[in-house]
Amino acid sequence: MGKEATRVRRRERKNIASGVAHVNSSFNNTTITITDAQGNTIAWSSAGTMGFKGSRKSTPYAAQVAAEDVSKKAQEHGMRTLEVEVAGPGSGRESALRALQAAGFTVTSIRDVTTIPHNGCRPRKRRRV
């Protein structure tokens, strides 16, 4: 008995006019996820999936390329307006936001949803360069 042929199921094209872009920019990478109003993922991309490795993932250019990729995927689903939620301390925040605006989306609101500890976990040690 051989392997059964696995059928590749194509994602059906949803027609969603507005959504939420979650831009998570850490010190190491930038991930961008576009969801509908309920939080269901429509499209996502990151600097790592765009072929950037190592320290190049954390650059603003890598975040811009990832934002252009995810906007192309989301526009295939008919998305036109976005609310943007930006989180994290990384360098790709502004460039990802500019790339989403340049892709033709109407950005209705921009929110910073970075979590701030009320003296929670102990932070990592200071870098000595």
From Swiss-Prot:
SUPFAM superfamilies: Translational machinery components. One of its GO terms (biological process) is translation. GO terms for molecular function: rRNA binding; structural constituent of ribosome. Keywords: Ribonucleoprotein, Ribosomal protein, RNA-binding, rRNA-binding. InterPro entries: Ribosomal_uS11 (IPR001971), Ribosomal_uS11_bac-type (IPR019981), Ribosomal_uS11_sf (IPR036967). Coiled coil: none annotated. GO terms for cellular component: cytosolic small ribosomal subunit. Belongs to the universal ribosomal protein uS11 family. HAMAP family: Ribosomal_uS11. Part of the 30S ribosomal subunit. Interacts with proteins S7 and S18. Binds to IF-3. Located on the platform of the 30S subunit, it bridges several disparate RNA helices of the 16S rRNA. Forms part of the Shine-Dalgarno cleft in the 70S ribosome. This is Small ribosomal subunit protein uS11.
